Amino acid sequence: MIEAIRIGIGGPVGSGKTRLVETLVPRLSAAGLSVAVITNDLVTDEDAQRVRRSGVIDPERVLAVETGACPHTAIREDPSANLAAAERLNRRFGDLDVILIESGGDNLAATFTSDLVDYWIFVIDTAAGDDIPRKKGIGLLQADLLVVNKIDLAALVGADLDMMRRDCAIARPVKPTVFTDLKSGHGLIELTERLIDGAMLGVGVP
């Protein structure tokens, strides 16, 4: 059995991780990839239920992991529950190409272990403050792809997008950053291109 590529999606609470999952699934599917999703929450399956209700994926292809601890534990120190969920999906769907693993909302230090994922994305948003890239949390520094989401809110919260772009370039000189408004779809084409290329998914961008 060839295992699917596992892609992690992490970031603070409310940054847009679940929206990113809901946005990526149809684009990856349109590129001819067979996709499944694992969500992580502390004591509920709220995010999994949301993804199932979204209509972008067969509900059977969505599994929930209830971590019962700090979210980063299940994606870094002890990923066994997520690995078990990934194995279940691989066995259930023999054609599976990609599994998106969404972490529970965490802080700027959240990272994925390479035992769990092949590639990972870190999501922040402008409403949390334009100084976030300058603070250089380890998640922001180490992620394969950084997504700065909710650029539509920047003017409303006084966030300086030009400064954020400069600070991201300083913090991540050789790693890509994409600025998005996932609600409207702004930046989605570039994000998908970066993901498909970076994770070596071997398909064209739809």
Swiss-Prot record:
Q: Give an example GO biological process.
A: urea catabolic process
Q: Which UniProt keywords apply?
A: Chaperone, Cytoplasm, GTP-binding, Nickel insertion, Nucleotide-binding
Q: What does this protein do?
A: Facilitates the functional incorporation of the urease nickel metallocenter. This process requires GTP hydrolysis, probably effectuated by UreG.
Family the UniProt entry places it in: Belongs to the SIMIBI class G3E GTPase family. UreG subfamily.
**Which compartments does it reside in?**
Cytoplasm
Which InterPro entries does the protein's record reference? CobW/HypB/UreG_nucleotide-bd, P-loop_NTPase, UreG
Q: Name its species.
A: Mycolicibacterium gilvum (strain PYR-GCK) (Mycobacterium gilvum (strain PYR-GCK))
Q: Which residues bind GTP?
A: 11-18
GO CC field: cytoplasm
Keyword Chaperone among record annotations: yes
Gene name for this UniProt entry: ureG
Protein name per its UniProtKB record: Urease accessory protein UreG
Question: What is known about its subunit structure?
Answer: Homodimer. UreD, UreF and UreG form a complex that acts as a GTP-hydrolysis-dependent molecular chaperone, activating the urease apoprotein by helping to assemble the nickel containing metallocenter of UreC. The UreE protein probably delivers the nickel.
